[in-house]
Amino acid sequence: MGNNLRIRGLNSRYILFLVDGERLVGEGAGGNINLDQIDVANIKRIEMINGAASVLYGSNAVGAVINVITKEPQEAIAAGCDISYQSNNTAKTRVHIESGQNKFLSQASIYRNSSDGFGAKGDGAYAASYADWGGNMKLGYKFNARTDINGTGRYFRHESFNPEGSLNATHPLTHNFSAGINGGYKSDNERYSLRASVNYDKYFDSDRYERKDETALSGTASNISSRLLNTFKPSEVWEIVAGAEQNHEENYSVKTLGSTPTTKSLDDVSLFGQGQYTAFGSLDIVGGARYTYNFQFGGAVTPKLSLMYKWKDFTFRAGSATAFRSPSIKELFYNFDHQGMFWVYGNPDLKAEKGLYNSLSAEYSGSRFYASAAAYRNDIKDKITQYEVVNELGGLEKYYKNTSSATITGLDINFSAIIFRHLYLKGSYSLCDATDNATGEQLSGNVKHSGTASATWNGNFLKGQYSVQIAGRFSSPHSYSSSGKTSLSKPYNIWKAVITKRFHLGKNDLNLTLKCDNLFNFQDPTFINPGRQYLIGLNYKFN
C-alpha cells in the first residue's frame, strides 16, 4: 500500500504518484493509493524527484514525485507468461502480448495475484487473505515521425477476506478503472514540441456480503486531469517549457463523510513555465514558477531555481524551491465512526501547507565506481497533523489541525562499485531529522536512520546468464500512535537472497527465480511481515 511509503520524513500524503506522467487516484476520501494496481512486470524504470524541485508538478509534490514509466513494445510481435509461488500460498500469474510493427503499437496484459495472508490466529502482525486481478492496455499510432496519438486503459480488482471465525457480515471489495488519451507533435528540426493529455481515474469501494451474493457500494473516488505541455528550443543553449494543468477530484461516501450519503469535490487549475540555460557547456541554470488556483484555498505562486555543474566525472547540484499542499478531502470533511473504536473528524478551516525546500548534492560517476552525497532542508509551515482526544465518556476522537511548522533536515549517501567484473556492490545510508517545531518531537512515523546494502554476482553458466544476490535494509526505531498512546518500534534489519538464471531456448527465453525473503526471520507486531518466506518464479518469453 502506498500509505506505508515514506520519503525524507514525509508520508504518502506529500508524495505525488504518477504512471507515465498521469496521476493515480486515491482510495476514497482517505487518499491512500494501493500500489498493487501497478503491473510490476511492465515497469521500464521509476523516476523520482525529491522535494518540490520541479514546476511541472503541483499540490502534493512537497516530499517527492514518483513517476512509473511503463515499457514500450520492442519486437514486431512478442508474448510471454510469468508464474510465481511463495509462502502463505501466495501465487502470481501474468500473461502479455505486444506488437510494435510499423506505425502501430499495441500492448495488453492480464494478471491474477492471491494469498492466504498471515497472522489470522493472532500470532503477531496480521495481513488479510486477498485475491486480485487486473489488466492493462496500450494502443498507439504514429502518423509520421513528428506526430503520434496514444490511448491507455487499466483495470484492477482487489478483494480481501475476513479470517476464519470472523463475525463480520461483509468484507472489502474494490475496483480501479482508468483511461487516458495523449498525443504530440514536434517540428522537423525538433526545436518545438507540443503534447496534450486527458486522463480519467476512478475508484469504487464496496462491501461484499459473506452469506449472500450481493455487493453494496460504500463510496467512490475519481480524478479527471488534463494537461498541455509546450517545449521550445530557440538555440542550442536554451530550452523553454510552458504549460497548463487542470484537476478535478470528487469523493462520494455513504459513511466516511457523514451519517448520510455525501459527495465532496476539490478543483484546481495551474499555469507553469520554466527556462533552462546552458553556460560554458557545463553549467545548467534552470528557473521557473508555477501558479495554482485552488477553488477551496485561492491562488499560490511557487518559484523554483536549480543549478547543475559538470566537471570531468563529477556533477554538483544546488536547488531551492517552494511548494504547497492543499488539504485532502479526508482532512477537510471526514465525519466517520470507525466501528465504534474511534471517531475521525475533518476540519474545514484548515489552511494549505507551504514548504521551502533547499538541497545540495555532489556525485562521482566513474567506469567502475559511483558515489553521491545529498544534503537537504525542508521547512513546512502550517503543517497538518492528526491529534487524539479521549472524550468524557472514554471514547477516542481524532482531529486535524495546522501545527506551527515542521523542519526536516537530512543527508543521503549512495555508492555502487563493480569489483572483479562479476561482483556488483551497492549501499546507501539516510539520516533524516524530522521535527515538529511545536513539540520538539520527531514527526510520527519518521525513521531517523536507515540504509540498504547489496552484493550481486553476475556470470554465465549453461549458455545463459545467472546472478546471485544478497540484499538487506535496516531501520532505526520510529514512533507510532496506538489507542491514544505514543510508542516506539524496535530497530530492525531485513535480508533476502535471490538467484536468477536465464535459459535460451532457440529464439525464446526462460527465466528462473529463487528467492528467500526475511532471511533471518525477523518478526515484530509493529512490522507487517510474516517472517521468512520462499519464492519460486518462472518467466517465459516468446519472440
State where each predicted segment sits:
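Short acidic/polar hinge/loop motifs at secondary-structure boundaries
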Residues: 23-50
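Extracytoplasmic beta-strand/coil segments of soluble accessory domains associated
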Residues: 1-22, 26, 44
